[in-house]
Swiss-Prot record:
Lineage, top ranks: Bacteria, Pseudomonadati, Pseudomonadota, Gammaproteobacteria, Enterobacterales
Main function: Required for the formation of a threonylcarbamoyl group on adenosine at position 37 (t(6)A37) in tRNAs that read codons beginning with adenine. Catalyzes the conversion of L-threonine, HCO(3)(-)/CO(2) and ATP to give threonylcarbamoyl-AMP (TC-AMP) as the acyladenylate intermediate, with the release of diphosphate.
Catalytically driven reaction(s): L-threonine + hydrogencarbonate + ATP = L-threonylcarbamoyladenylate + diphosphate + H2O
Enzyme class: transferase
Any one of the GO BP annotations: tRNA threonylcarbamoyladenosine modification
Gene3D superfamilies: DHBP synthase
Originating species: Wigglesworthia glossinidia brevipalpis
Designated name of the protein: Threonylcarbamoyl-AMP synthase
GO molecular function: ATP binding; double-stranded RNA binding; L-threonylcarbamoyladenylate synthase; tRNA binding
Location in the cell: Cytoplasm
Keyword Glycoprotein on entry: no
EC id: 2.7.7.87
YrdC-like domain boundaries: 11-194
Family to which the UniProt record says this protein belongs: Belongs to the SUA5 family. TsaC subfamily.
InterPro entries, per the entry: DHBP_synth_RibB-like_a/b_dom, Sua5-like_dom, TC-AMP_synthase, TC-AMP_synthase_SUA5
Length: 194
């Protein structure tokens, strides 16, 4: 298994994560509240590896996390929302709120699953921003665990839950104890409390 610590989070070390993403692999990385698993959201090969690793159903859809709003342009249909809606959403980013928004018509079906909206977040958490900025696009963000189990909060738990076949970015998780809040971008309903 390959992993490294934040002390060594130099560009060349981050490139191990980026290269794994480009090679359609799954990576583990710290998020604001737990370790996450991520991959290229546009790669069916990578998504299939993620689904297999987590033993997760493909019809659930995924959250994608970005370094900035412009990275979401290929995924969300802003024309379907009023300026007021967009302002309410965008003023929470970067931040720890995931929004369900209308998707672009041509996005990969596995991102929304059986849902009509896509789950997106712009993070301000340093490791996520760094990965997405260097990768040049958002990544999938799902908890590092087998589907239905408690998410991993450290490297030892990742190894125990998922084995040693993924690259892990070893860095402390953020300050939150719960996953991100999820809100509906059309009616502002809270789907999952943060």
């Amino acid at each position: 298994m390959l992993y490294f610590t934040i002390k060594n989070m130099k560009f060349r070390n981050l490139m191990k994560i980026i290269n794994a993403l480009r090679e359609e692999e799954v990576v583990a990385y710290p998020t604001e509240s737990m370790f996450g698993l991520g991959c290229d959201p546009d790669s069916i090969s990578a998504v299939n590896k993620l689904i297999y690793l987590k033993k997760r159903k493909i019809n659930k859809g995924f959250i994608i996390v970005a370094a900035n709003i412009s990275q979401l342009n290929n995924y969300i249909d802003c024309t379907s929302l009023s300026k007021n809606n967009l302002n309410k959403i965008f003023c929470t980013w970067p931040g720890f709120i995931t929004w369900l928004m209308p998707p672009k018509k041509d996005i990969p079906c596995w991102l929304i699953g059986n849902n009509s909206l896509i789950a997106v977040r712009v993070s301000n958490f340093f490791p996520i921003k760094k990965i997405c900025n260097i990768f040049g696009k958002p990544i999938i963000s799902t908890s590092a665990n087998l589907s239905g189990e408690i998410p991993a909060k450290n490297i030892k738990e990742i190894k125990h839950k998922l084995g040693s076949k993924i690259i892990i970015l070893d860095h402390p998780i953020g300050k939150y104890s719960n996953p991100s809040e999820i809100r509906n971008g059309i009616n502002y309903k809270i789907i999952r409390k943060g």
